[in-house]
């Protein structure tokens, strides 16, 4: 996938950074990548700070990854220090009511759950 990069800042942690636009075209690759990361790491952070657009297939893949992580006793977290249009997709879809998220990379990589976003 051209628009994602995976980094491993600490043992057991993976950060998948989304750049540009994310839609139906790369759905299957994204699902496979998220499944693998959740299986192999205790914390997976999906970083949308460089994303320009996300569609419902991306949001659904994130929800599925979160459910898989919870079943395995692992953590899945969003980093949403991002553009207003991307944040709006998360807010309007209701995804933020179901997923752990923060606006801070340091908080996203920490052990404690981030505080909810406050307007």
Predicted regions and their residues:
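STAS-like cytosolic regulatory interaction modules
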Residues: 1-52, 64-119
């Amino acid at each position: 996938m051209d628009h994602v990069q995976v980094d491993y800042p600490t043992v057991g942690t993976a950060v998948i950074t989304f750049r540009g636009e994310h839609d139906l075209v790369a759905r299957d690759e994204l699902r496979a990548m998220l499944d693998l990361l959740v299986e192999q790491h205790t914390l997976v952070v999906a970083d949308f700070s460089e994303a320009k657009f996300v569609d419902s297939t991306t949001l659904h893949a994130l929800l599925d990854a979160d459910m898989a992580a919870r079943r395995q006793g692992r953590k899945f977290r969003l980093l949403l220090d991002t553009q207003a249009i991307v944040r709006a997709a998360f807010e309007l879809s209701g995804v933020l009511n179901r997923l752990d998220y923060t606006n801070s990379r340091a908080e996203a990589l920490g052990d404690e759950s981030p505080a909810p976003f406050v307007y």
